[in-house]
Amino acid sequence: MKFSELFSDRFYLVALSILIPTSINLSITQFLTPILNSFMVRSTNPELSISVFSISMSILFLISLPHLRVQHLTIVYYKNYSKMKIHFFIFLLAIICLIISIFVIFSPAVNFVLDTIFGTSGEMRINVENALRISFFIPFLLILKMHFYAISIVSSKSNYIWIGTISGFIFSILFASILYFLNFEK
């Protein structure tokens, strides 16, 4: 095969059309974190705001840990197995993580997590608990997001990845803005 024929192959266009949005999606967090930090630094107690955000997100990401492998699982099995079985399995996994999230956040288990594991107290503990209560659904959404991104990759529908990445970015900024302007920390 000649060098010129190598790049006329449609594979390279499809690969780039998937690689670019997925790469941006993976690195959007590095871009979004300083923006969110800039909101938190403007609060009346920046150290508290950043600490509350960090602890809350750590707990939520721990609960949603399966989301890190859902994308791979979907990519590997989506074309060779029943799509309904895969959708059901992922939905079941998302529901299980949601139930765990509800149990940890809305039961006395939150006392063990916040007091014993993270050692929070006073105003920080109250704010972390409030942050967890308004974001308890994040593990559910993360699992579904990774599943749908994987379907987009397998079906070569990069426009869905762009839509998901851009809308996630916009909603994150919008949500942070609303919380900031409503003075949520009080």
PLM features: residue spans?
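Alpha-helical transmembrane segments of multipass membrane proteins
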Residues: 21, 25, 29-33, 64, ...
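Short alpha-helical transmembrane segments in multi-pass integral membrane proteins
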Residues: 1-22, 75-138, 178-186
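Membrane-interface helix-loop junctions in multi-pass transport and translocation proteins
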Residues: 48, 159, 169-186
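Small-residue-rich hydrophobic transmembrane alpha-helices
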Residues: 52-101, 145-156, 160
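Residue-level signature of transmembrane alpha-helical cores of multipass secondary-active transporters
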Residues: 18-26, 60-61, 135, 161
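Short runs within selected transmembrane alpha-helices of multi-pass transporters and secretion channels
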Residues: 68-71, 134-153, 161-171, 186
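Helix-terminus/linker motif at the lipid-water interface of multi-pass membrane proteins
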Residues: 23, 27-51, 115-120, 180-183
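Interfacial/gating helices of multi-pass transporter permease domains
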Residues: 11-18, 37-61, 123-127, 186
